[in-house]
Amino acid sequence: MRFVIQRVNHAKCTIDGNITGSIEKGLCVLIGVAESDTKEIADKMIKKLVNMRIFADENDKTNLSINDVDGRLILISQFTLYANCKKGNRPSFVEAGSPDMANELYEYCISECEKAVSGVQRGVFGADMKIELENDGPFTIVLDSDKL
């Protein structure tokens, strides 16, 4: 499983001009699911995400978590995080989870994040989404379950 975590001042997801999720200060998280991922792996990733200290404290040191700053989450599914570009110029996505399995784990991530953080917003799995955000920093972290 891969999360691309971006600290944002605000972010929103729209589909066909309709806003499906919008947050102010918080994290925009792109979620990629591999075929080998499980709920146990998702639990480890979510625990790391929720407890990651990437917001500045009063001394401007990254020492505060999303809950410490009353921040929000917007979770966006993105199978392209598992693009393999080793051969040729067209990415392969064979390492990405099948749509049914990936959607199940994406929904699980949303459900578990809602238990841990107030103000969780979302995109729509498999939809053609437009993501608009303002990075804060920028501060971006790629979290890969293979490296936890």
For each predicted feature, which ranges?
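Residue-level signal for inorganic ion chemistry
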Residues: 45, 76, 139
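Compact, glycine-rich, soluble single-domain proteins
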Residues: 19-70, 83-111, 115, 121
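Short beta-strand segments
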Residues: 6, 32, 77, 132, ...
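Short, low-complexity, polybasic intrinsically disordered segments
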Residues: 94-96, 136-148
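Divalent-metal-activated hydrolytic enzyme cores
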Residues: 115-129, 134
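Short glycine-enriched loops at secondary-structure junctions
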Residues: 9, 73, 78-81
